[in-house]
């Protein structure tokens, strides 16, 4: 654990952002500017980040000011206010916000948004109005914000993930600005959740990364539903749809990854052990492919989903807040969370739940957790999923009729208007289910794109569209595929694999052209993984 301070010189006109408590104002000396930052809260040195570049601050124009809520308007929507009592802290001494009544009452902390000038207007429209509501939603659930301020920075297409959180700074890929506000809101909520789980509370053993990523994945749904002010029933429906999508993704991950990489607690009872020299070993830490895996996100999410089902969401979220109050500023192990959970809900022991059972069924084993199998039927019967299944049936019938009769008649717009409009996550599921259909006519793909305006949807939806384009060798939309590989590099790695596996000469030429064009700007890990796929 460490604190830090830094004085950074950079070319005049550039911007320096850092993991720092203060909003640094530069001083100038000729062609250079100097920026000074500091942190007083001890954190793992690995959380330190610095960004230097030519970005502009995104501020609300007059037409947007009405969309930026005031602290008072946000606080009125929060039904779970922080307790006025001050928790006792278990960490080393530092100026802790959890001991500060003013910090406790802050629904959202001061924030700034930065982006390349070319994305300023898009960030102003999509991202800026979401920051305060998402911060407030997080406060409603977990209480005191661990950090006094936050900068949100839009990073280039070559960034290796959709987002990353560090103390006082959140990095978001430009991909989150695609579509409307759904993907941006969800990812922003995920990174905000890391302020509590991943930063204020960290994993004592780095192999237990589910403590960070699984928790943030679980909380992103809760925060986003709160930020949207959804009813309890609407939030439940969204959660069921997301659970089904994550279950399908987890199945794919398990089928296409090594078993060793699927274990959430790979060191088991030896977790957090230190050698005589003081060193610890992080299993698979140098595996470049691991950073593109989502097992720890997904499986970790389902661990928490399982525990939530045992006690109910309201009680589970109250427990989360208690856990944060006790363990903020500390490094933890899985057993710390589970021990406090079993201590809080001791009646579960009589129902057969124990820490050992969670280890055996969830944390210490590869593959799909057996307790999950009972939940899948419930998810598929939810209203939002049934709507998608009905639309899939319509599209399959549309394709069959087209194959039989399209040579004699043209499809009219009346063939399309009967299709229902879908939410972004519903569109993702629709395209995934259509991907499982053996064949779809070119005309069906054409109308599918037109009806849902797939080129204007967010990157998650467009990724599934690209998978359909690859599978059916729909050459008309190869431009969509090239655009995706260039503009959404963190997500494009999966498409490179599918393009090569398809063994189509034209598609493989496309892969090589894109890689040659992009390789110099690619993230090194991504470049290595893609190069191994195609050469």
Residue ranges and their predicted role:
Residues 26-32, 346-351, 419:
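Short, glycine- and charge-enriched coil/turn segments that flank and shape catalytic ligand pockets
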Residues 37, 85-105, 110-407:
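Hydrophobic alpha-helical and helix-loop surface patches within well-folded domains
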Residues 6-8, 16, 37, 50, ...:
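Generic structural hydrophobic/aromatic packing signal, biased to beta-strands
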Residues 42, 176-177, 470:
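Hydrophobic pocket-lining residues within nucleotide cofactor-binding pockets
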